[in-house]
Amino acid sequence: MTDSTYDVARVRTYLQDLQTRIADALGALDGTPLATDAWQRGPAERLRGGGCTRILEGGRVFERAGIGFSDVAGDALPPSASAARPQLAGRGFEALGVSLVLHPRNPYCPTVHMNVRMLIATKPGEEPVFWFGGGMDLTPVYGFEDDARHFHQTCKDALDPFGVELYPRFKKWCDEYFFLKHRNEMRGIGGIFFDDFSEPGFERSFDMMQSVGDAFLQAYLPIVERRAELPYGERERDFQAYRRGRYVEFNLVFDRGTLFGLQSGGRTESILMSMPPVANWRYNWQPEPGSPEARLYSDFIVPRDWI
């Protein structure tokens, strides 16, 4: 850590505003406002604090859209948060962040995930340790190269002011993180992912996190606007449900945010709002060679330089 001076109030204000801005934009696009569910945990519970969930289900564009803000504290960092820093195991902590997953109705519209967060680990008699994490990644059912290039270029543009080395570093991290080991396949086309980030100090790290959060709508909404009205049929919806099964597998088996929430006694409804509304599994299914479904596997959910 380069310093231990930080301003949680500023981070909290930014995150709450980010949630509102994104929820308003999605509601305007869909034509249905996102519902608001504010929640609070009691002081005697294992995880203290509260948050707000903005949720849309059964919309015109989004079959499910969830954006969660939370600011919680606990007495001991769970294993998922301290795996990379064993010296912090057992410390008290505060975690605040915004996390979203959007599942569009149209199979030609990709699912997207974005998260920005800050964690502070504390121990009596020692300086607090803080770090930022987050990123965004795109999970298409049917791939479009111009969508992938646009998404990755927007991510790069958000990071370049803080160092041209960050995009390739965070892109590689994303490719490796969102990988289903038991399937030997990527979850989607990636994006950027970072964690344990505080190298430049609080101000610069916070600015970088804000740049990522602020870039989300520009990265994603133009893609939805291009694809949301494309015609589709039962075949495309079936493949969408099949690919959503992979999303479920990753979130429940590998995702550090999901594991952190469940291990720390988090709010289950908020943690699992990332699940798709419909998913299915087929035994040993393979796409027809040369089909659009096969092209997802050969051309998109493989490590690739998009820009």
Swiss-Prot record:
Name its cellular compartments.
Answer: Cytoplasm
What class does this enzyme belong to in the EC scheme? oxidoreductase
Judging by the UniProt lineage, the source's domain of life is: Bacteria
Q: What is its main location?
A: cytoplasm
Summarize the subunit comment.
Homodimer.
Q: Which cofactor does it need?
A: a divalent metal cation
E.C. number(s) listed in UniProt? 1.3.3.3
Where in the chain is the site Important for dimerization? H182
Family the UniProt entry places it in: Belongs to the aerobic coproporphyrinogen-III oxidase family.
Where are the annotated coiled coils located?
none
Residues covered by region (Important for dimerization): 247-282
User: Which GO BP annotation is one of this protein's?
Assistant: protoporphyrinogen IX biosynthetic process
- Residues the entry annotates as binding substrate: S99, N115, V116, R117, G265, G266, R267
Q: Pathway it belongs to? A: Porphyrin-containing compound metabolism; protoporphyrin-IX biosynthesis; protoporphyrinogen-IX from coproporphyrinogen-III (O2 route): step 1/1
GO MF annotations in UniProt: coproporphyrinogen oxidase activity; metal ion binding; protein homodimerization activity
UniProt keyword list: Cytoplasm, Heme biosynthesis, Metal-binding, Oxidoreductase, Porphyrin biosynthesis
Annotated active site residues, numbered on this chain, are H113
The family database entries (SUPFAM superfamilies) matched by this protein are listed as: Coproporphyrinogen III oxidase (SSF102886)
Question: Could you identify this protein by its name?
Answer: Oxygen-dependent coproporphyrinogen-III oxidase
Please write the reaction equations for the catalytic activity of this protein: coproporphyrinogen III + O2 + 2 H(+) = protoporphyrinogen IX + 2 CO2 + 2 H2O
Question: What's a single GO CC term here?
Answer: cytoplasm
For a divalent metal cation, which residues are the binding ones? H103, H113, H152, H182
Task: Identify the Pfam families for this entry.
Answer: Coprogen_oxidas
What is its biological role? Involved in the heme biosynthesis. Catalyzes the aerobic oxidative decarboxylation of propionate groups of rings A and B of coproporphyrinogen-III to yield the vinyl groups in protoporphyrinogen-IX.
